[in-house]
């Protein structure tokens, strides 16, 4: 499916809310997001290397889906469970609407590496290095203009979300490949927790 939009999220979770956070994410948050027209897939990852604890991204038809009436209605009317999680569980939130370009169009893997940057693309991300690392799939993400509005959910978190300018996603079959790639390009390695698709 040729989806052109990404909602990319990196975050930590307060340890005392971890169990509640996981139940909420799996039984309410992912299904609710995937109910919005234009959302096709949500994937959750857990950190293998230092950095944020969690990484989640959603594939959408195009970035405009993330300013649609249906999506904004959800953001502005959080459920009681969402209010609690946003206010007390989430921290160090980095949330960005992106356009995406698929560089290597292979199957999704069970492990991944992300690297975000501002300005020029890091030299280490040259085609030769990427090929040497052997990813199954590679995508580049670029922030769009759909990142300016402060939603009710963001207000609950009590601090403005961080934003990326650009990021790369490399997907691998095995953990050792992801760890090697993260060490080589200075990124963070992840293992897949869950996928929900339409």
Protein language model features and the residues they cover:
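Macromolecular interaction modules
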Residues: 1-198
């Amino acid at each position: 499916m040729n989806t052109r939009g990404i909602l990319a999220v990196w975050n930590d979770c307060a340890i005392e809310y971890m169990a509640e956070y996981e139940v909420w994410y799996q039984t309410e948050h992912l299904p609710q997001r995937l109910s919005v027209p234009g959302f096709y897939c949500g994937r959750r990852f857990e950190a293998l290397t230092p950095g944020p604890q969690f990484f989640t991204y959603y594939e959408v038809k195009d970035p405009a889906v993330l300013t649609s009436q249906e999506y904004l209605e959800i953001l502005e009317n959080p459920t009681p469970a969402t209010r609690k999680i946003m206010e007390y569980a989430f921290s160090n939130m980095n949330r960005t609407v992106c356009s995406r370009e698929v560089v290597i169009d292979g199957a999704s893997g069970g492990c991944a590496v992300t690297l975000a940057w501002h300005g020029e693309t890091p030299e280490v991300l040259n085609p030769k290095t990427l090929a040497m690392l052997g990813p199954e799939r590679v995508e580049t993400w670029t922030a769009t203009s759909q990142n300016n509005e402060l939603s009710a959910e963001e207000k609950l978190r009590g601090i403005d979300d961080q934003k990326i300018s650009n990021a790369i996603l490399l997907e691998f079959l095995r953990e050792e490949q992801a760890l090697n790639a993260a060490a080589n390009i200075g990124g963070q390695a992840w293992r897949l927790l869950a996928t929900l698709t339409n």
